Amino acid sequence: MRQGYSPSYPLRDERITEDRLRFANLVRRQVYILLGLGLLSLTAMAVGALATWNVADPSFSHATDNPVTNALGYPGAVFSDLAMQFFGLASVPALLPLAVWSLLLMIRGYIGRIARRSLAWVGAALLFAAIASCFAVPQSWPMPIGLGGVFGDMLLRIPGFFLGGFPQGAIASAIALVLAFPALWFCFFASGIIGRGAEAVNPAMLSANRSADDEFADEDADNEAGGGFHFIGALTHLVLMTTATIRRMTGLGRRRSREDDFDDMRMVRRSAETRNAPPPRARKARVEQTAPSPKPGPRAQREAQPSFLKDNGIFEMPSLHFLAEPKLVQRDPALSKDALEQNARLLAGVLEDFGVRGEIINVKPGPVVTLYELEPAPGIKSSRVIGLADDIARSMSAIAARVAVIPGRNAIGIELPNPKREMVYLREMLASRDFEQSKAKLALALGKTINGEPVIADIAKMPHVLVAGTTGSGKSVAINTMILSLLYRMTPQECRLIMIDPKMLELSVYDGIPHLLTPVVTDPKKAVVALKWTVREMEDRYRKMSKVGVRNIDGFNQRVGLAQKKGEPIARTVQTGFDRNTGEAIYETEELDLEPMPYIVVIIDEMADLMMVAGKDIEGAVQRLAQMARAAGIHVIMATQRPSVDVITGTIKANFPTRISFQVTSKIDSRTILGEQGAEQLLGQGDMLFMAGGGRIQRVHGPFVGDDEVERIVQHLKLQGVPEYLDAITEDEDDDEGGSGPAGTGNLEDSDDPYDQAVAVVLRDKKASTSYIQRRLGIGYNRAASIIERMEDEGIVGPANHAGKREILVPTGDDDF
């Protein structure tokens, strides 16, 4: 036998240990059934005692020599007298939880939340007593207290204290109606009819429910109505358990596959009679639980959202209440321990049928898919297993199956969709502690991993993202989640947005929020101009950072903020020339008037339309931004629904190391985006493959956000202030005029001051914009912007409106006539 392998047949000691465990579980199960029968008997005796109650029977409150007429004798007379004295007629409905508890013990073997349900039982009994006391006492009532007993009268004295007397008539009826709902809720909760969605499964009973009787146990857990059928199911459960245990102990069930405890379960491969192949070895496989929901951060626990100071007031961040709250759903029975074990064995058998030898070593269930980790036998090529993705999906009766090598491990991941898909909500991601306490400067909530863990990415480190996917794959929803992730963390002073939407549908809803630098660009020609402006802004930022002597935008903002805090201007010493007499260099101190620079995120929703209009210009601008804009704080999120080589060119791919692929139609499109196949096997609706820097691919399930949620957030942001648009972003420039010299300024050569020339141009042409002054005077953008700001300060032109236009306030010669 080859070293390192062992037979797949179980050892004798393991079988004995397993049989002992099953026998112990069987005994424990019978104890619970006996306890349930005992409790049911006591409940029936209590009902019989109350049904035959007679006030004349001897008891603690009546010392008489009359014969006992109660069906249970003197103990029944004492019990019924005490119950009627304290609770009155409410003693009868108060016995309902006890009857349900007895059935639960016999069927399920445990009662969840017993402490809380006991308190709810007491509360229900008291409320039922108060309701009974609200009714008028008939003349035939033999007791001097109300129908609700002592406790009912005591509770009604509370409203009587405020009403000035014991409630009667219509007031008593109203009080009874008010108390009816909480009384029923307490009664149902105490009985276990409601409030069972979050109960934990009793681990002691798991092993007892793992045989041929699993179907009965599942039916009992799902269908809780009908006590008679459940009792029959419990007896059938007992018979099957006893038969199965006897067969195992006598050796008849040795060839049946056994399941150990869930955390240390053993995956046994089906033996394949292959020539020169050693028998498969049995290894312990670890089945992981789904990661718990992300823990909410401090922001989700505060009632009011934090406020950030702004120059013209207070900017209030959007509230998490604008987003839909995650719904509580019960765990899918298909993801139970037994079901995962069975699927793992079935998958191992399918692989052996196709000639792939190996074993399942790990199982990771998630909200959308389940990952089965396969450790192949020596000599098995990973490409062979990857090529079987369609055959595996067919054999496992799944919609699709994705097979990929797990980086850094000797394992191949096989991802199969769950029968029931769970929804991932954006509110759950933004309220999580991982997102709020993330140190990322521009954090994006991408979604959850296969195991249910949140994925928070930093676009400042990416530094650009390429998103691709077909229509309906969830690409537009992912763009919205990225935008909302920025809006929930960044103020307009910290991050500004440029949105380019040639489709005129997806991003137009954000038009008017204060984070925008320009209205949403829908014209492809203006989109080219906006990208060129972004390139010029990047170059201008680099010049500013060079003057200050820093290497990135964070260092620049820190340096400028520190100078503003101290009240000291930033100055530098520059050489202006040489002294004519001595020849020594002349140095002057230049004061720099600088402000902190916000991050700029350029969002392009459809790249294919732009490439059709101006492919070379778009590709050149995107290439320069992708190569150089990271240190300047400018980042690009580019999306397309046509992932072909004419849209995603080699130049663009080389400069976008971070890529996200949603469902595509073919393997060729998947290779175009990610460099490998697999995206064609995605499930759609936010299911994505996230490739971070370095080529490591991770499957992520994106969160969902509805249009109504986006509209509520946008309306809130619009109330915080108007956007400060820059008209130069979308105004086309005539490079030919600007390169040769000032255009149209022949009559202004007598003035050496550019400001005077600019004022004359504005008054003559009645046009006031930064780009217009820049073209007419042949000066740089920064200088033209300073001139326009000076004109606004001196009252020559007004502030820019929502479209970026300015009104000329100084009357011209034409206005006099």
Curated annotation (Swiss-Prot):
Residue stretches making up the FtsK domain = 452-671
- Chief location bin: membrane
Does the record bear Cell division in its keywords? yes
| InterPro entries registered for this protein in UniProt | AAA+_ATPase, FtsK/SpoIIIE/SftA, FtsK_4TM, FtsK_alpha, FtsK_dom, Ftsk_gamma, P-loop_NTPase, WH-like_DNA-bd_sf
Superkingdom: Bacteria
Q: Which CDD domains match?
A: TrwB_TraG_TraD_VirD4
GO cellular component terms?
plasma membrane
User: What's the subunit arrangement here?
Assistant: Homohexamer. Forms a ring that surrounds DNA.
Would you tell me the protein name for this molecule? Answer: DNA translocase FtsK
User: In which residue ranges is the amino acid composition biased (Basic and acidic residues)?
Assistant: 264-273
Subcellular localization is given as:
Cell inner membrane
Family listed: Belongs to the FtsK/SpoIIIE/SftA family.
* Protein's GO biological process: cell division; chromosome segregation
Question: Domain remarks in the entry?
Answer: Consists of an N-terminal domain, which is sufficient for the localization to the septal ring and is required for cell division, followed by a linker domain, and a C-terminal domain, which forms the translocation motor involved in chromosome segregation. The C-terminal domain can be further subdivided into alpha, beta and gamma subdomains. The alpha and beta subdomains multimerise to produce a hexameric ring, contain the nucleotide binding motif and form the DNA pump.
Q: Indicate which residues the UniProt annotation says bind ATP.
A: G472, S473, G474, K475, S476, V477
Q: Where is this region: Disordered?
A: 252-304, 731-753
Task: Tell me how this protein sits in the membrane.
Answer: Multi-pass membrane protein
